[in-house]
Design a protein with these regions (language model features):
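Glycine-rich phosphate-binding loops of nucleotide-dependent enzymes
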Residues: 1-166
Length: 166
């Protein structure tokens, strides 16, 4: 799979075909049997999952992708756990991409709608300023209206020069 910055590439296939498994292998959660994972020309295949995140891969799983008992802002801060710098400016960028999150920043994520929770998950994944964002079935369990809105947000993320694989 080849994904360049500013592109969206979708892996298609029936249930059980290995789409999620492939993403988990790219993130280092599963061992590769062959092939390699390269980001910006650097082979990261031998790196641990944490080192791959530091190298620029961010992943939003299909389920259990937010901390329901934490606020929106606390969820975003969790996405910055590997950052050594002041990440407040990145939180502001996330609020610009997803304005509703600014309004809801002190609200528990468990009280949000499905679409808003997905925005929190996307925002948290963007806190590391990834070069590659992997989304495992980002529209699972959301209504068609929310799905359209979510794709609008994914396109906004693409415009920030992030490669998106879903």
């Amino acid at each position: 799979v080849d994904v360049n910055r500013g592109e969206i590439v979708s892996i298609l296939g029936p249930n059980g075909a290995g789409k999620s498994t492939a993403m988990k292998a790219m993130l280092g959660l599963l061992n590769l049997k062959s092939g390699s994972v390269v980001i910006d020309g650097k082979d990261i295949s031998k790196l641990s999952p944490q080192e791959r995140v530091r190298a620029g891969i961010s992943f939003v799983p299909q389920t259990k992708n937010v901390f329901s008992g934490m606020t929106v802002e606390e969820n975003l801060e969790m996405g910055a756990y590997l950052r050594d710098d002041n990440y407040q400016n990145v939180i502001e960028e996330i609020y610009e991409l997803f304005p509703i999150l600014r309004e809801k920043r002190n609200q528990l994520v468990g009280e949000l709608s499905g679409g808003q929770r997905q925005q929190v998950a996307l925002g948290r994944a963007l806190m590391i300023k990834p070069s590659v964002l992997m989304l495992d079935e980002p529209t699972a369990g959301v209504s068609p209206i929310v799905m359209d809105e979510l794709f609008d947000h994914i396109i906004k993320v693409k415009r920030t020069n992030v490669a998106i694989l879903m």
